[in-house]
Amino acid sequence: MIKKIISDSGANVLHLDDASFENIPLTIHVDGTDYQDDASLSVNEFIEALHQNDGKTSTACPSIAQWQKAFEGADEIYAITITSVLSGSYNSAVQAASLYREDHPETKIHVIDSLSAGPEMELIIDKLKESIDAGLNFDEICAKINAYKEKTHLNFALESLDNLAKNGRISPAVAKVAKMLKIRIIGR
């Protein structure tokens, strides 16, 4: 039986030792250029493009087809996504799972909204791997991960609000005042 962990790139995990794992990249649009958030991404080039860009940046979640392709060949699938508050990745994965089950009704798929990003997603992925390695069955793993998610959270600090202002998430005036007063936003 093949058990597979799949995550979008919001987790910043490219591979797992001794586990069936796949990372599906988010796409980041900056000034007419698309950057795939995967191992081929030049972080320095990407950061430079962000600094030089005065316009809006945006992201695109993995497509339903990308999720379905990643599901292929596995009997049990644990798909974890960046928070559904920030991305359509969770909805895309849920739709992909529903469509995939139509042709593969024996495949078990658990789509997990991390309600987070980055390091917290990595913790959930580690807990998934640990649960699989411990020999837990599908239902036990799903229950364990759902309970684990209730105990984790991510705190973060933003050095700048510039990108939030560029993308219409906050007022440019708020970003400017925060910058002048050297205010950093701490969130959870």
Predicted regions and their residues:
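Mixed-charge interfacial surface used for oligomerization/domain docking
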Residues: K3, G10-T27, G32-T33, L86-S89, ...
